[in-house]
Amino acid sequence: MNAAQTSFPLTADISIPAVGFGTYLIAEDAAPAAVSSAMSCGYRHIDTASGYRNETGVGEGIRRGLAAAGLTRDALFVTAKLWPGNPAWGDAPKTGAQTLAECDASLKRLGLDHVDLYLIHAPYGGDQRLHQWRALLQLKDAGKARSVGVSNFNIGHLEEIKSAGLPMPDANQIELHPWSQKPELVAYMAEHGIAPIAYSSLVPLSTWRSEPGQDSAKTDEMRADGKIFSDMAAKYGVSEAQLLLRWGVQNGYAVLPKSLNAHRMRQNLDLFSFAIDDADIARMATMDRGDGVAWASGDPSR
């Protein structure tokens, strides 16, 4: 079994690849080569967002990757995201009409007539949040998004949708790794048929966002504690990244590693030649620190 053949159910008739290629912090001009290289390594899910400011480059990479592999569009799963606005940053929330227009703009930049999953990137829409969600449901009905979901939503945000009598999201993309396990949210999502997609799976790595100026809430204590994962990875004969990604897929979460190195791209796909044993899974369950670590400004789901 390999990652290209493994997927998790998203809707009754749509599955999401277990391992996708994340494109956050990949520059527009680097995206074509990165995405096409990832596809040549075997990735069949590409994750991007309007907020990443690289959709044009990602779209070019998709076209190159499909052509090089002799694949058609339906062989690839593409996720895009609406930036909902954020009043705290002086960015007015998108209205329902603006949400529809934003999706059209993303599709144009990507050079696609539809995406496989379209997400509201964060719950920052305030009183426009439900209008944004209704717009996503319209996009699904129109065939511009095969499935729709949210990102960084907590139980309260999801209950808002439920209380409005609207269909629940197909997926919620959230920060998930041994230091931020969100058991109550994950259980709620399972109860309501919302697929979990994990981002920032590699937070515990010493190299994760280690460059000066890269945003995170990672402390020196956390950096010191990361050695436990290197010891555990050595036990299985895998990299720390593979161990952390395997933790995600073993829990049923689609994961989204990013690398510009072809060797590591392939390595991050190789998650099904080993399994973390029950004792280590139990040990990792004790490492939960609660809120996310990915953002210095705090967990966006709060």
What are these language model-derived features?
Residues I26-M39, A92-L110, G156-E159:
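Short, acidic/polar
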Residues T56-A67, C103-L107, L136, L158:
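Short, well-ordered amphipathic alpha-helices
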Residues T72-P87, Y118, P123, N152, ...:
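A short, structured active-site edge motif that brings together acidic residues
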